[in-house]
């Protein structure tokens, strides 16, 4: 049987790797895998296909402008991968035709698997950083390298976290193909309990998770991915917020809405006195004629109330 170049990115490189245009992705533990990576160049004014590049699992390369000739090249392929393939490349390549492949989109995976600043070296906003302009084969190579890193990062996650994100993202078309590629089976789990356990101390313990799980599973996944970061300058990419505007609302619910009962997270992270000490080094807020104006303004801000704070001279602006 011919060796399949898609594999585990952690495995050792074999002697044939240098001659294979598709770098070994790791002996794939879920069995033989037939895949291709595709990229399409579209004209800015005529919105027509100007060039197509594709890399196949057996090392074959396709570089033509004919989508009709691409189809025989993909004949034995099971997984069709690319960067923004679902809502861009596939739309131009196959139009309304039924797609027989499982689509794996590296774009939607990147903010989930690499949410930490400085993010992934191959991605800027929603674009791949390419070495060559208007070369779809080169873009396929970059998409392949990004996919490799995404596979390795997924494998490096703790099993409980993988189970949690699988439960949230199964049946989401932008991610489902990747989960299938990684053999991520859906197991019975109490998602609310899983999230509360994995993110204990990093989100409000009393937040109502059930409505978020039911109505915003994808947005919740992006929010949790950002919460996992340790660099406070890490942000959700603008294109994610454009496609999933509820991400900001969910982060506010999880992290910036103090619960009435009080919990470990809210009592420590949303306490204005603790923050005053940790951020500014002061033990107490300044008062003005006995009135704690600073404290009231800070508390109103933490509670998300609309406010306009006007301090008199000497009042602690």
Where in the sequence are the language-model features?
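Short, glycine/acidic-rich hinge or "gate" loops at secondary-structure transitions
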Residues: 157-165
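N-terminal helicase ATP-binding lobe
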Residues: 164-317
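Generic beta-sheet signal
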Residues: 35, 78-80, 305-309
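N-terminal accessory regions of nucleic-acid-interacting proteins
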Residues: 1-33, 105
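Flexible, charged surface loops at secondary-structure boundaries
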Residues: 28-32, 72-78, 302-303
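Short, flexible loop/turn motifs enriched in small residues
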Residues: 44-51
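Conserved DEDDh/DEDDy metal-dependent 3′-5′ exonuclease domain
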Residues: 53-129, 133-154
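Two-metal-ion RNase H-like nuclease active-site motif
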Residues: 33-43
């Amino acid at each position: 049987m011919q060796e399949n170049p898609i594999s585990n990115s952690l495995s050792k490189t074999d002697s044939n790797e240098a001659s294979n245009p598709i770098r070994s992705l790791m002996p794939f533990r879920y069995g033989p895998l037939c895949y291709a990576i595709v990229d399409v160049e579209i004209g800015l004014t005529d919105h027509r296909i100007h060039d197509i590049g594709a890399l196949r699992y057996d090392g074959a390369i396709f570089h033509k402008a004919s989508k009709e000739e691409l189809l025989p090249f993909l004949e034995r392929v099971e997984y069709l991968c690319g960067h923004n393939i679902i809502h861009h490349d596939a739309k131009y390549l196959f139009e309304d035709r039924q797609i027989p492949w499982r689509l794996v989109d590296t774009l939607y995976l990147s903010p989930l698997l690499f949410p930490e600043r400085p993010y992934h070296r191959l991605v800027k906003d929603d674009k791949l950083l390419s070495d060559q302009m208007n070369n779809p084969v080169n873009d396929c190579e970059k998409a392949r390298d990004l996919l490799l890193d995404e596979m390795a990062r997924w494998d490096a996650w703790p099993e409980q976290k993988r189970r949690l994100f699988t439960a949230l993202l199964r049946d989401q078309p932008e991610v489902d193909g990747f989960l299938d590629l990684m053999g991520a089976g859906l197991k019975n789990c109490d998602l609310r309990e899983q999230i509360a356990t994995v993110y204990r101390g990093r989100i409000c313990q009393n937040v109502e998770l059930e409505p978020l799980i039911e109505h915003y599973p994808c947005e919740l996944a992006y929010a949790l991915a950002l919460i996992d970061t340790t660099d406070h300058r890490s942000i959700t990419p603008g294109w994610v917020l454009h496609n999933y505007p509820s991400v900001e609302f969910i982060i506010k619910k999880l992290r910036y809405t103090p619960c009435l009962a009080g919990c470990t997270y809210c009592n420590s992270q949303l306490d204005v006195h603790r923050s005053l000490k940790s951020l500014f080094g002061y033990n107490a807020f300044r008062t003005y004629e006995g009135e704690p104006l600073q404290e009231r303004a800070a508390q109103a801000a933490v509670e998300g109330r609309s406010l306009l704070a006007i301090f008199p001279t000497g009042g602690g602006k």
